[in-house]
């Protein structure tokens, strides 16, 4: 009996408010659009900051080797063997 009353009340209900007011849908669409743009900008900013931090840390690591020079001589030198005169 209660389910029949609920069904009857649902049939009498007029259109849903969201379907009757398209302006509300447009406003919600604009809010979601702006939300997407803001999130995209924040994501790009974060990626750029991470990339800059990685470059800075790489340069900092390279600074350790700044004072070092490569050897001018080879570790192993070739011996010059002269043939004795005959």
Curated annotation (Swiss-Prot):
ITAM domain residues: 54-82
Ribonucleoprotein listed as a keyword: no
Modified residues (Phosphotyrosine): 65, 76
Signal peptide limits: 1-18
Modified residues (Phosphothreonine): 78
Stretches that traverse the bilayer: 24-44
InterPro entries according to UniProt: CD3_zeta/IgE_Fc_rcpt_gamma (IPR021663), FCER1G (IPR042340), Phos_immunorcpt_sig_ITAM (IPR003110)
GO CC list: cell surface; external side of plasma membrane; Fc-epsilon receptor I complex; Fc-gamma receptor III complex; membrane raft; plasma membrane
Cell compartment(s), UniProt: Cell membrane
Parts of the chain on the Extracellular side: 19-23
Cytoplasmic-facing ranges: 45-86
Gene Ontology BP term (one): integrin-mediated signaling pathway
Membrane topology, record value: Single-pass type I membrane protein
Free-text tissue specificity from the UniProt record: Expressed in mast cells (at protein level). Expressed in basophils (at protein level).
UniProt KW keywords: Cell membrane, Disulfide bond, IgE-binding protein, Immunity, Innate immunity, Membrane, Metal-binding, Phosphoprotein, Receptor, Signal, Transmembrane, Transmembrane helix
Keyword Transmembrane in annotation: yes
GO MF annotation: an example: IgG binding
Location, primary (coarse class): membrane
PANTHER family hit by this protein: HIGH AFFINITY IMMUNOGLOBULIN EPSILON RECEPTOR GAMMA-SUBUNIT, HIGH AFFINITY IMMUNOGLOBULIN EPSILON RECEPTOR SUBUNIT GAMMA
Biological role: Adapter protein containing an immunoreceptor tyrosine-based activation motif (ITAM) that transduces activation signals from various immunoreceptors. As a component of the high-affinity immunoglobulin E (IgE) receptor, mediates allergic inflammatory signaling in mast cells. As a constitutive component of interleukin-3 receptor complex, selectively mediates interleukin 4/IL4 production by basophils, priming T-cells toward effector T-helper 2 subset. Associates with pattern recognition receptors CLEC4D and CLEC4E to form a functional signaling complex in myeloid cells.
Family: Belongs to the CD3Z/FCER1G family.
Subunit note: IgE Fc receptor is a tetramer of an alpha chain, a beta chain, and two disulfide linked gamma chains. Associates with FCGR1A; forms a functional signaling complex. The signaling subunit of immunoglobulin gamma (IgG) Fc receptor complex. As a homodimer or a heterodimer of CD247 and FCER1G, associates with the ligand binding subunit FCGR3A to form a functional receptor complex. Associates with CLEC6A. Interacts with CLEC4E. Interacts (via ITAM domain) with SYK (via SH2 domains); activates SYK, enabling integrin-mediated activation of neutrophils and macrophages.
Annotated protein name in UniProt: High affinity immunoglobulin epsilon receptor subunit gamma
Organism this protein belongs to: Mus musculus
């Amino acid at each position: 009996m209660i389910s029949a009353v609920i069904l009857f009340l649902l049939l009498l209900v007029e259109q849903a408010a969201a379907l009757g007011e398209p302006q509300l849908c447009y406003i919600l669409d604009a809010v979601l659009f702006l939300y997407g743009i803001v999130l995209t900008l924040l994501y790009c900013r974060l990626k750029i900051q991470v990339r800059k931090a990685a470059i800075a840390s790489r340069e900092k690591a390279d600074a350790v080797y700044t004072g070092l020079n490569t050897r001018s001589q080879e570790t192993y030198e070739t011996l010059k063997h002269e043939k004795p005169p005959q």
